[in-house]
Amino acid sequence: MSKDWTKIRAKVKDFIENEIYPKETELAKGTPESREMLGSLMQLAKDEKIWALGHPTDIGGGGMPFMEYVYVNEVIGRSSFAMVALGTHSLQDSIMLREFASPHWRDQYLEPLVQGEIFPSFGMTEPEVASSDPTQLQTTAILEDGVWRICLLYTSPSPRDTEV
């Protein structure tokens, strides 16, 4: 490991302490203003060259070696807003798309995902499926009239509609 990661970690820590922590109460409100504030923090992280540090360089990330990134990410993990503000929230999804997606899906989603223009989401807990293996998922999606309808399986005993 190089010693450069310690400087990067210190810069990230300062960014979180000076830019994110003071704004957490406002960010937590989920208002249009707080979303705009988060967008400004994302841009500031890009300007400061501390955006998406663990992402490979060929997809627009910082290319930081994994073990060095672990120490930086420990600081990032202290604030749920820091993960988004610093572009680390999409690392696993970005690598998955980079490695396994068809060129069409990579071209459509990878760059916007790494740049923070779109956000990943993945749900995996289902009844009758005791597994962390996504190939075991039973939820389906059906395209109806140009709109995807997700057919969910609920774990709650309360009655509810099975489609969203």
Name each model feature, range by range.
Residues 1-87, 104-115:
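Amphipathic, small/basic residue-rich leader segments at the start of a protein or domain
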Residues 58, 125-129:
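Short, solvent-exposed loop/turn elements at beta->coil junctions and helix N-caps
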Residues 139-141:
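A structural signal for short hydrophobic beta-strand segments in well-ordered beta-sheet cores
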Residues 154-161:
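Conserved small/polar residues in nucleotide/adenosyl-binding loops
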